Each structure stands twice: as structure tokens, then as C-alpha cells.
Amino acid sequence: MDLSAALEFLRAHNINLGVNNALVAWRALERGIRVQGDAKGRVRMRAYGRTMRFKHGWTNLNPRIVGRCTVNKDVTSRLLRPRGVRAPENAFFGADDIKRAWAWAEPILPVVVKPSNSTKGRLVYVGITDVDDFGAAFASVAEVFGGALVEEFVPGVEHRVTVVGGAVVAATRRVAANVVGDGGSTVGELVAEKNRQRADGSNPIHKYIALDSFADRELTRQGLTLQSVPSAGQRVFLRATTNLHTGGDAVDATDALTPVDIQLVERAARALPGLKLGGFDVLRPPPGDAGEPCVLEVNMSPMLSMHHYPWEGQPREVASRLIDVMYPETADKDHRLE
């Protein structure tokens, strides 16, 4: 079975389409586990007297309390810090509390303004340094969500580290939507070419780069426009945030993790009661910085497919690790990172 066959299986069995669902169903079927769809379109697996469910990263392996703890980013930070895990200082403010929010933010500028729950990188404003930008960002987020999370800006290189069964199994360095100059093409032409590459279907998870107000803002910050011609090898960013849903690149970084990184993430996983599957957004210190990693947030519906289909680097077999934990009777070896 390959990915296209797995997607056809989902269609035939009333399971919600998606690469994550297809990967998990595929790996379960390979082990002889019975797979069906349930009334909610989830992957329903049955073997050894146990029923497991999966849908777009969510699984009933995780108890509900974990989801309640992590749905709001400020709550997650307050759970992690007392357990020795570095996490950013942050606070949520209602739509009418912009003055109080600015008073909280001003002493620790620059800050990040974003929704308090996951939005896949949308409406996230990074590196706010003045009251005008703060007010515009706060109003934009609060209009949609009734308030905004204000958070200290932590410098570093963002990674998504996936934990299965308490162990780190893979890591991806997510690079914000970008193009690399060839010395002759404009930024707009480079974006069009990268979007054409993403349309061919060979990598099913990477999204188009949108040319919108967020792209304009980021280009302006770099002193560029869509008509600019970057030099050969010059990387131009179209987003300040690194989310794949807004056109970012997934670059495998599993082998780059240090023992300190792995220990920190696994300690964070233990701080969340009953967690079996989670995606940890971790800021690793910039090169040459001796600081410790920082856990930005925890996602209870992690995108497993980013590890299977990186834009650059080695694919990692994460779906099989999940089946190992769901049905250890079918596991053939220990996949824990050393």
C-alpha cells in the first residue's frame, strides 16, 4: 500500500481525508489491525481487545484533561515553569483591556501578540516594539477571538518536536515562508515558481505561499517589494512566523537535537498528566548562545506528516511509533532516541 492507496481506503470507509489519517491507517493495516471509520469520520482501530481512534493528530490515547490543560497557551506555560521547563511569560487580555495589555507589555518589549489557542500560525504578530504596532495587532486578534495573548519574545530557532509514549521521536525545524534568490528573478516570480513546485503533488503537506498583507509587512521589514530582485542565494521571507499552514518549510532536524533538548522536552511531556502524543514547539538558542531551550506551546493534534514529508532532510517514521504505543504487541523494536 502507498499513500494514494491509503487515501482511497479512507474514502471507501467513510474516514475523513487527510495525510495524517492516511499514514496512521496505512501503518495499522500493515500490521493486521482492523481499521474502520466511525460516526465522526475518525480512524477507528481495533485489536487485542482495545479500540483506538485517531483524527488529524488527535487520539484517544491522550486523556481529556491534557487537552484542557494545553488548549490555552498561558495555562500551558504556568504548568511547565514550576516543573523546571523554561516557557515564556504571557498573559491573556480581553478585547477592552488594551491599555492594561500595553502596560504589561511595555517593560518587556519586544513582544508577541497572538490568539490564546491554536490558529495554525494565523494572526500571530511577532517582534512588536511600539505602541502603534501593538494596538493594531491587538485589535486584529481581539476582533476575531474576543481578546489576545501577549507574550514575551524569546529569540531562538523554532522546532517542532514530537513526543510519542513519553519519548522524543522526531524533530522538524520550521522555516517561515521564503524564497531564495537566483540573481535574475523578482520576489514575485520566485514565489510563483515555488508555488508551482508545491502544486505537483510530490510533497503533499506543503502549502502555497500567499501574497497578502502579512507578506507585504515582512517584505517591508527587509526593505524589499515583490518587484525586488534578490541576489543569488539571498533568502527572502514572506512571513514572520514559521507555520507550515502559511507556506513554511519543514526541514528535518532530528539529528540536531542535543541531549539537553531531548531531556527538556521529555520533562515537559511528563508535566502534562497522561500525555502520550504531543507536538512541542521549542525555541532552541541561536548558534553560539549558551541559553536553555524554551517550550512555546504544546499541540495535542500534532502534524505527524511533516516528519514523513519534509521539504528538506530525512523522512522520519512517526506513524509507526504511534502504532507501537497503541498496540505494543505489534512493535518490533525500541524507537526511542538515544
Task: List each model region and its residues.
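ATP-binding N-terminal substructure of ATP-dependent carboxylate-amine bond-forming enzymes
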Residues: 1-71, 75-78
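Short acidic (Asp/Glu) and glycine-rich catalytic loops that position anionic groups and cofactors
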Residues: 3-5, 241-247, 297-302
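Generic non-transmembrane alpha-helical segments
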Residues: 27, 31, 83, 104, ...
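Short, surface-exposed charged micro-motifs
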Residues: 32-34, 160, 281
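A short beta-strand motif that forms the metal-chelation/ATP-contact edge
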Residues: 44-54, 160-170, 288-306
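Active-site nucleotide/adenylate-binding loops and adjacent lid/helix of ATP-dependent enzymes
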Residues: 52-56, 61-209, 259-262
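A long amphipathic alpha-helix within ATP-dependent nucleotide-binding catalytic cores
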Residues: 193-288
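C-terminal active-site "lid" helix and adjoining low-complexity regulatory extension at the edge
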Residues: 249-263, 270-277, 284-338
